[in-house]
Amino acid sequence: MTETVVVLGAGYAGAGAIKSLENHLDGDADIVWVADHEYHLVLHESHRVIRNPDVRGSVRLGVDEIKSPGTRFIRGSVTGLDTAEREISLDDGSTVSYDYALVALGSRTAYYGIPGLDEHSLTLKSLDDALSIHERVKEAAREGTPEDPATIVVGGAGLSGIQTAGEIAEFRDSRRAPVEIHLLEALEEIFPGNDPELQGALRKRLVERGIEISTANPITEADDGAIYFDSGDPLEYDVFVWTGGITGRDCLTDSDLENDHNRVNADANFRTSNDRVFAIGDSAIIDLGDTPAPPTAQAAWQAAEVAGKNLARETRGQVLDTWTYENKGTLISVGEAAVAHGIPGVPIGTFGGPAAKLLKKGVAARWIADMTSIGRAARAWPDM
């Protein structure tokens, strides 16, 4: 009897695993793909939609563009996973049976119990989120004046927060909109935990774009018009975007899989506490010893290739590969500019300019080409 492998999620981890699984299984098992949407979002470029909604067509890849005809796709939100029955529950009440499952559900925004943060902030986790930010910023800019500009606040100065602030600055400048932008970070410096040279390069470009940066002052509360801090005066705002962290999806709460804050624990071969369930991406915490993988697109891409191979090997009773994360550097955009750091083979540690911008565009285009086609990537190139 043919076995069934079910992949949950259409983010970088899920979509990448589908491509890898199709390649390595070679028709030896049935593949079922379950996801909330009938598309994969190129999330690390979704901030472009904030400035220009027309970009959505470039960052939205339909599942039929990605999967082979033999892979069955089911649109639905996962509500539970029963390892005893080997069943996945969906929001419409249906279930999907599996012999092996890969959890690649991504993450949701973490609010850390800060009062009012969930209720009064926008997030950037989906295409609809990016479109909502665009509309809210446009509306606020329309109501602002040079004497009383609209205040746009981005909370969290990690990758997503920096890129979001940069894109809002491009929106402002391209439309000469009366907007001031604030980027907030609770820790001592923007892009926390990274190389000081990279942090300095990013800060320089943000300041050049007229973005006001505040660090080392955590948010303690938010209401419908102001943000409150550990010290100092409240900051009144018109639009508040929160990008300050991630946590696991609630649908895994009742699962018996070992997890930490709903992120499933997995070994370096991606097997979880249940032999028939594997996990990768933001929904997983992979045990890599002293070098944990970051919750980034780069890590998800790498893991997806090995996870697909391992699931195919598991169905054949073969020994599984162990994944080792390879840091291939960091690429971040600040509007039309970009900063690159730690790129293998490049003697300069941190650099910007056309070379950094070209590298960032190239990475996005390569992912789109790998998922769909070179032609699709070429059409998306101007929007990256």
Predicted regions, residues:
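C-terminal, flexible cofactor-proximal segment of oxidoreductases
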Residues: L25, A303-M384
